[in-house]
Amino acid sequence: FIALGGATSSTAAHGIDNVGLARFVAGIIFPVGLMIIVFVGGELFTGNCLIVMDVVGKKVTWFECVRNLIVVYFSNLIGALIIDTLIYFSGNLDYSGGLLGAYAIKVAVGKVGISPLKGITSGILCNILVCIAILMAVAATDIVGKVWAIFFPIMAFVVGGFEHCVANMFYIPVGMMAAQNPVYVAKAQEAYGLTAEQIQGLTVLHSLNNFIPVTIGNILGGMVFVGIPCYFIYKKKWQKWHADTKTV
């Protein structure tokens, strides 16, 4: 679902030259991914970092928390790769004479070239906003409230250009696929000034330059900056909520 949000937001933003405006347009559309997850009961790795609240509250063990995160992480990866493949073969990247395919390459090149420090810090900032969106959605009492609770924090992380490991499971692989198409490659070199060396650097090994630090940052942002502080700030309310949900 996050991959679908990434695909549709890229389609909307790829033809906009102004970076700020392009991010704003993408930010308006991208939140649909998390909305679908929340409303259909899906699992998202970054949101599940909030399980740490149950760990600190002794409702689940660290082993159960880590097991959940590992299973969900790789499930999200499989789902994203399926969407990547469908998007590529659907011809979606042919939009604007192949410019969307070139845009996918440009985005992927930028992401695999990220420094470890930037990946971690950007990942922290991203998942602070994602986890806040999840908590706000849980607090909202109706669908409209949940929609707006999700919309603004997720829009903020997209506009801010922060790194989200699950979103990158769409952006990087689809860019790698696009890099195998000579039409998209030529367009990327023409429109964005990318070199053949940069495009050839789109490999699984180089993708780890992004996934490892960004995943670490997302975990820190969700657990250390949101989950644990929120547990201690709202400890009594959290315990009461758990007690109430047990009786329902």
For the regions a language model picked out, list residue spans one by one.
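Alpha-helical transmembrane segments and their helix-helix packing motifs
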Residues: 1-248
